[in-house]
């Protein structure tokens, strides 16, 4: 979670460097990245469509993307439904939709299935796989190994800012290195 905050310029790093897209200036790079770092924050009494309209206006991008985004996240048929009528999985999919406004190349998600019931977890995992098949790079922070195995192609295991292990998921899971996760 801390790493995601740093790479999104929400938190300042106390050491180290990184760059996006071959060293693109940070403000330009940030426009290519969609993110969901916390619990979705929408107006309960507004429709999915109106909530995305507000989000697009605040971000100053993606206003014309609303229909497409709602189709991408499987909520187009419910675009006029109030947010308060959505299941937890639908709320999370709408939040991912908000992160997709403006057509980012990269999507950063912090614990995207946290607090969801099994049906919601399945919905979000399927959405993540679908978005990746569309060419969107997705970076996920998760403490759930099962989630990582089911939706990720590569994994990096960090402890207190230090990289312990990284590589393709299958290779890391077969590794002889023993990692104790607490």
Locate each region found by the language model:
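ABC ATPase "signature
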Residues: 166-167
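Helix-to-loop junction immediately C-terminal to a conserved catalytic motif
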Residues: 8
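Conserved ABC transporter NBD signature motif
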Residues: 15-29
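Catalytic Walker B motif of ABC-type/P-loop ATPase nucleotide-binding domains
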Residues: 107-111
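Conserved ABC ATPase "signature" region
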Residues: 53, 57, 63-78
């Amino acid at each position: 979670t801390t790493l995601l905050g740093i790479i999104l310029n929400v938190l300042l790093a106390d050491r180290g460097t990184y760059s996006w897209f071959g060293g693109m200036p940070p403000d330009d790079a940030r426009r290519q990245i969609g993110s969901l770092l916390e619990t979705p924050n929408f107006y309960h009494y507004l429709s999915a469509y109106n909530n995305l309209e507000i989000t697009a206006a605040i971000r100053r991008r993606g206003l014309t993307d609303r229909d497409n985004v709602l189709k991408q996240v499987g909520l187009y048929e419910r675009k006029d439904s109030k947010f308060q009528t959505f299941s937890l999985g639908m709320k999370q999919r709408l939040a991912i939709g908000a992160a997709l406004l403006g057509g980012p190349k990269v999507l950063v998600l912090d614990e995207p299935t946290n607090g969801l019931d099994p049906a919601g977890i399945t919905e979000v995992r399927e959405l993540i796989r679908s978005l990746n098949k569309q060419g969107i790079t997705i970076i996920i922070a998760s403490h759930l190994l099962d989630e990582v195995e089911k939706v990720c192609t590569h994994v990096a295991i960090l402890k207190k800012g230090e990289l312990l292990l990284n590589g393709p998921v299958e290779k890391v899971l077969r590794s002889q290195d023993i990692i104790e996760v607490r």
